[in-house]
């Protein structure tokens, strides 16, 4: 197993638009306080001493990123993304170099806690396949009838988890699994699903449920509340 003090490179896919936010500005560039959501997300990664480099994957022609202080940060590299998230993550991995382990974190997930990140990073010592931050499902889950807004039945929530990010894997393994899944036309919704497709079983590391992804307009106020609370706790 790898040592606990090895350097880690992070990949942040930030090429999405996020139409559900109902704004002209891509959600990662919306502001919470005096920083964009993307800046909050990246700074949470760089706050851990093992994360020494971040690859940010943006859309070709993105003119907003160059206006951020992140554009001149010595630990940040920017590359162009692809059509789908998996294409963008693969482009980021190719820019990582020879890092043994890679974190992948959503650009629009700004409320990552350092204790969750620290627990996830211990997988480089204990696991050969890596894992993800996740939160157990607490709500009652319903499956709809096909094509209808009608309940088919209640789903047993035991054993169900919400997949969060960061997700943390050996670089070569993630690269190979993403490449195979894309070449074979598999549906890849997150990085762990590429490993699952190839027969691996990444670990679930329980994380805080307030590590939310800003997807809809109401999420912005909630993320601002969580971030303000965290900053207050750190300063007291």
Swiss-Prot record:
Site (Transition state stabilizer) found at 20, 27
Under Gene Ontology molecular function, one entry of this record is:
2-C-methyl-D-erythritol 4-phosphate cytidylyltransferase activity
Which pathway does it operate in? Answer: Isoprenoid biosynthesis; isopentenyl diphosphate biosynthesis via DXP pathway; isopentenyl diphosphate from 1-deoxy-D-xylulose 5-phosphate: step 2/6
Q: What is the disulfide pattern of this chain?
A: none
In Pfam terms, one family for this protein is IspD
Name the Gene3D superfamilies on file. Spore Coat Polysaccharide Biosynthesis Protein SpsA, Chain A
Tree of life domain: Bacteria
**Enzyme kind, highest EC tier:** transferase
In the record, biological process GO terms are: isopentenyl diphosphate biosynthetic process, methylerythritol 4-phosphate pathway
Is Metal-binding tagged as a keyword? no
EC assignment: 2.7.7.60
Site (Positions MEP for the nucleophilic attack): give the residues: 157, 213
Listed A to Z, the keywords are: Isoprene biosynthesis, Nucleotidyltransferase, Transferase
**UniProt xrefs under InterPro entries:** IspD (IPR001228), IspD/TarI (IPR034683), IspD/TarI_cytidylyltransf_bact (IPR050088), ISPD_synthase_CS (IPR018294), Nucleotide-diphossugar_trans (IPR029044)
Q: Which PROSITE patterns match?
A: ISPD (PS01295)
Catalytic reaction list: 2-C-methyl-D-erythritol 4-phosphate + CTP + H(+) = 4-CDP-2-C-methyl-D-erythritol + diphosphate
Q: Please give the function described in this protein's UniProt entry.
A: Catalyzes the formation of 4-diphosphocytidyl-2-C-methyl-D-erythritol from CTP and 2-C-methyl-D-erythritol 4-phosphate (MEP).
Which family does the record assign?
A: Belongs to the IspD/TarI cytidylyltransferase family. IspD subfamily.
Per UniProt, subunit arrangement is: Homodimer.
HAMAP family, sorted? IspD
Q: What is this protein called?
A: 2-C-methyl-D-erythritol 4-phosphate cytidylyltransferase
Q: Which organism is it from?
A: Escherichia fergusonii (strain ATCC 35469 / DSM 13698 / CCUG 18766 / IAM 14443 / JCM 21226 / LMG 7866 / NBRC 102419 / NCTC 12128 / CDC 0568-73)
Q: Which gene encodes it?
A: ispD
